[in-house]
């Protein structure tokens, strides 16, 4: 089934000018179509004005009137560590007060705090926390994430974290690829 969003007050687009992606200053070139329309099924098939959309064959197309609404691309977060346990909020307060990361780590804090909490947590506990964070990201406009491990610091815990990353729901699994290690680096 295809859907046509039409009469969009502000349709925000990315002007890639035919490029597969854009970076740097080119990212400031944001387009806007007023009174826009967008046709999509599994992928975006057409973007233009609501007036131009009247030329589209709407047989078997669900039409949604978006009068007064803004439509924009979703955010992409390509580096998350959503599978974790514990909190280091108290360390943030110390950092704001002037403590260095090295000082906090020397006292057993830093990543070691998270490592211990992750190792002690069950897969179900880690999954519940990751699910909560993933749903929050989705509610705030992030449509694609990559979930990385990294807090286990040993093979067994890293594998546990990667398994949890594949359990979370809310995105299709192609949008939540686990990334076990940097390509070319040896696994231990």
Regions found by a protein language model. Give the residues of each.
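Solvent-exposed loop/turn tips at the surfaces of repeat/solenoid architectures
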Residues: 7-8, 42
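Histidine-rich, glycine-flanked metal-binding segment
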Residues: 14-71
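Alpha-helical scaffold segments that flank or form the walls of functional sites
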Residues: 39, 69-71, 88-147, 163-170
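Hydrophobic faces of well-ordered beta-strands that scaffold small-molecule active sites
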Residues: 76-78, 145-147, 176-180
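Active-site beta-loop-alpha junctions enriched in small/polar residues
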Residues: 81, 150-152, 181-187
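Divalent-metal (often Zn2+) His-rich catalytic cores of metallo-beta-lactamase-fold enzymes
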Residues: 147-161
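Histidine/acidic residue-rich metal-binding segments in metalloenzymes
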Residues: 157-178
């Amino acid at each position: 089934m295809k859907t046509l969003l039409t009469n969009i007050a502000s349709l925000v687009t990315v002007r890639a000018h035919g490029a597969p992606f854009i970076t740097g200053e080119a990212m400031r070139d944001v387009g806007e179509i007023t009174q826009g329309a967008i046709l999509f099924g599994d992928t975006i098939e057409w973007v233009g004005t609501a007036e131009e959309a009247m030329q589209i064959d709407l047989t078997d197309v669900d039409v949604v009137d978006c009068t007064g609404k803004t439509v924009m691309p979703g955010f992409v977060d390509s580096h998350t560590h959503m599978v974790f346990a514990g909190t280091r909020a108290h360390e943030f307060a110390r950092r704001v007060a002037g403590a260095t990361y090295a000082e906090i780590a020397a006292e057993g804090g830093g990543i070691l705090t998270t490592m211990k909490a992750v190792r002690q947590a069950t897969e179900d506990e880690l999954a519940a926390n990751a699910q909560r964070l993933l749903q929050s990201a989705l509610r705030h406009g992030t449509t694609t994430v990559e979930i990385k491990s990294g807090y286990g610091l040993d093979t067994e815990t890293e594998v546990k974290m990667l398994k949890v990353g594949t359990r979370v729901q809310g995105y299709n699994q192609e949008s939540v690829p686990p990334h076990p290690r940097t390509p070319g680096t040896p696994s231990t």
